[in-house]
Amino acid sequence: MDQYLVLGTGVGGGIVLDGHVWMVYTGGAGELSGLLVDFNAMGLPFPQSMSALWANRISAASITKAYAERKGLESADGIMLFDAYEAGDEDAKAVLEEFGFQAAAGIMSLQATLDLQRYAIGGGISARPETTEIIRKAFDDLYDPLAAFMPYGKPEIVTCKFGNEANLIGALAFHLWKA
C-alpha cells in the first residue's frame, strides 16, 4: 500500500492498495487537507480554527504565506522561498524546517494508522529536491529516537515521479478505471 501526498494549494492524497485507489465509505479516503494537527486550535473561532488543519501547515500556499509574513512582504511564491533558502536566508530556512516538521508529524500520524511502506510527495513544490529531503530529515528526527517502541515500520519518503501533474494523472486514471 502506498500513500501519495500532493502539496499545493491544499494537501491532496490518495491511498493505493493492491493497485487500486482505496475509496472506502464516501470516496474521500486520503483527502488529507482536513487532517487535524492542532487540537487546541479547534476551540478558536473561525477563521483561526482553520490553523488546526494540516493543509494550513504544509501546503505550498501556507508556507509561502509564512515566509512573506516573516519578511514583511505582501506575498511570496515558492521560487522566491527556495531561492532564499539556497542563498542561506535564515527566515526561509526556519519556514522550511517548520514545514518539514509539520509534514513529518502528519506522516507519522498516518503511519500509526496505515503502516505504509512508502509516502510519495507530489505537487509543484516537489519539483525542488529539497522538499523531500527536508521532510525525510524531519521524519527521521521524529521517528528514529522512538523506533524501538513503534509497532509500525519506518516508511520510505520519496518524490513522486509525476511531480506537479500527480493529482491530474491520478484523477484521469481514476476516471478511466471507473468508466
Regions found by a protein language model. Name each.
Residues 1-55:
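Glycine-rich phosphate-binding loop of actin/hexokinase-like ATP-binding domains
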